[in-house]
Amino acid sequence: MMQESATETISNSSMNQNGMSTLSSQLDAGSRDGRSSGDTSSEVSTVELLHLQQQQALQAARQLLLQQQTSGLKSPKSSDKQRPLQVPVSVAMMTPQVITPQQMQQILQQQVLSPQQLQALLQQQQAVMLQQQQLQEFYKKQQEQLHLQLLQQQQQQQQQQQQQQQQQQQQQQQQQQQQQQQQQQQQQQHPGKQAKEQQQQQQQQQQLAAQQLVFQQQLLQMQQLQQQQHLLSLQRQGLISIPPGQAALPVQSLPQAGLSPAEIQQLWKEVTGVHSMEDNGIKHGGLDLTTNNSSSTTSSTTSKASPPITHHSIVNGQSSVLNARRDSSSHEETGASHTLYGHGVCKWPGCESICEDFGQFLKHLNNEHALDDRSTAQCRVQMQVVQQLEIQLSKERERLQAMMTHLHMRPSEPKPSPKPLNLVSSVTMSKNMLETSPQSLPQTPTTPTAPVTPITQGPSVITPASVPNVGAIRRRHSDKYNIPMSSEIAPNYEFYKNADVRPPFTYATLIRQAIMESSDRQLTLNEIYSWFTRTFAYFRRNAATWKNAVRHNLSLHKCFVRVENVKGAVWTVDEVEYQKRRSQKITGSPTLVKNIPTSLGYGAALNASLQAALAESSLPLLSNPGLINNASSGLLQAVHEDLNGSLDHIDSNGNSSPGCSPQPHIHSIHVKEEPVIAEDEDCPMSLVTTANHSPELEDDREIEEEPLSEDLE
């Protein structure tokens, strides 16, 4: 609307709108002057006049619009003065788009404005433009000042905040200093308070130690009572015989009741293991000692005595030796009998913390293995391990009985239904029968019962009942008797390479052998895996299981050292640490076992294993000559000679008096040598595991508990 009004004002020369009287009078006067002075306008060229008039018309239109807006939009507010300054600029820039050169030509032809008027209008327009520029500069300056003021205010606020933070920090420091001063003053005022607290802590520790001693005494009493109850239950079942004048058997008379030393030691370990677990729960849960121990231990011990195996009574001198031994170690009975403590190390699964004495072990047990979720989960895992081992044990027992039955039979005699027997089993006899007939004849194959080997009175050497008491299922006889591993693998290299049979070595021994066979005595983890699969067919399956065991052994044993080099991480063997570890674990005399020649076949190795088993079983008896009489010594020597194959058929009549001859002859046992079948589903078990163990060989049983835990990982 503003543009149209401007064009109409210029073209029609009627400037009567919005109080434009001054401009209209000027235009009338100019038109009159233009008509009278036509000579002057004719002198100017048309092009220059057209250009000049166009500029003057534009400036006049701008000035008219400015005057119109300033007169109509005035307000007393100071803040509104800046608004009319910005509007003329936009209008003046838009007006040239509306006024065309044709319209300017018409204005010049009609001679509305004279050149003098146009010059005056041009000067006015320049003045107006200068004012606009000044106003714009002033507006910019004001904006800059406002911006600077805002920045200054922000900086002041930040400085104030920083000052407040510094003041708060100073106040906090002052408060801390005041608190420290107060504490120092209190300590100065009460110097004996810390000493009193230390005394109270010492008293509490002494009370705990006294309570632990009381608990241990109660446990020992309960163990004795439970062992007596177990013996009574065995007497009721007819498994042992007690003289009529003896009502209750003490703990020291266990060997006279017909139990072997290994069975006594295993029974003792089971009872103390149950008590240690229940004692841990009692100290944290406030339970009663006398409620659960008898039922749980009786059930566990009776289950172990369930196989109906008959025993001979052991020689009379052994109980006195056990009594003397227990009297000498009575001050260490509590620490030695605890299942979770041995050789100064905590035997809790996955712990292996070093404890200097039994008191420190009890503190460690109460603090680290309390009744919490972790310990409960570990107990569940141990229950699963025990279940798996019981299943494996039943399979291995059946296999052992079948092997012994096969080796015990005569190959010429047909046997329709053979029954599993012991290699050297005993016949249940009364004392009168033993005195009148010290030696019994073997039964014929036509009788319904299986043939029994005739022996003189003496301890049973190998019985199925002794198998679960030896601790580990696979006895690493090469590790036990310090036989080099390479000497045993060499003759059977092809056998292990092709047959799916578990090699009778620990993972640590196999890893060391792999590293020692390498050229630079160092291997990466993948190279160790490759050696396992290349050397043994057994490790070509179940890779996840045994690879985890290999990694576990590498990180567990200190003899394996991890070294970083150009190839990456490699493993080496610290031979000093390895030999130190073996010397700590290996007990017993290796001279009792004959070295296995490398030139022998697998059958010869089997005979050598049987020799090692008999030597180990007779070790507690041979160590003390006072424990055996002439008959038992003759029996052991005869069995050794018989298994070595040195006796074929000696003394066909079979008459020898144990009282007259120190070495009575017995009927020969035909041992059939056959290689182990490679298609067995389970791992082979070394026959050394069938040997009975005495308390002196308890450390050997602990050595072999390691491979089982590795296999189950």
Swiss-Prot record:
SUPFAM superfamilies: Winged helix' DNA-binding domain. Signal peptide: none annotated. A zinc finger (C2H2-type) spans 344-369. Its main location: nucleus. InterPro entries: FH_FOXP1_P2, Fork_head_dom, FOXP, FOXP-CC, TF_fork_head_CS_2, WH-like_DNA-bd_sf, WH_DNA-bd_sf. Residues 386-407 are annotated as: Leucine-zipper. Residues 1-44, 283-337, 436-463, 647-666, 676-713 are annotated as: Disordered. Residues 420-424 are annotated as: CTBP1-binding. It is found in: Nucleus. The keyword Zinc-finger applies. GO terms for cellular component: nucleus. Residues 324-335 have a biased composition (Basic and acidic residues). CDD domains: FH_FOXP2. PROSITE patterns: FORK_HEAD_2, FORK_HEAD_3, ZINC_FINGER_C2H2_1. Residues 290-303, 436-457 have a biased composition (Low complexity). Keywords: DNA-binding, Metal-binding, Nucleus, Repressor, Transcription, Transcription regulation, Zinc, Zinc-finger. Residues 502-592 bind DNA. The leucine-zipper is required for dimerization and transcriptional repression. PANTHER family: FORKHEAD BOX P, ISOFORM C, FORKHEAD BOX PROTEIN P2. This is Forkhead box protein P2. It comes from Gorilla gorilla gorilla.
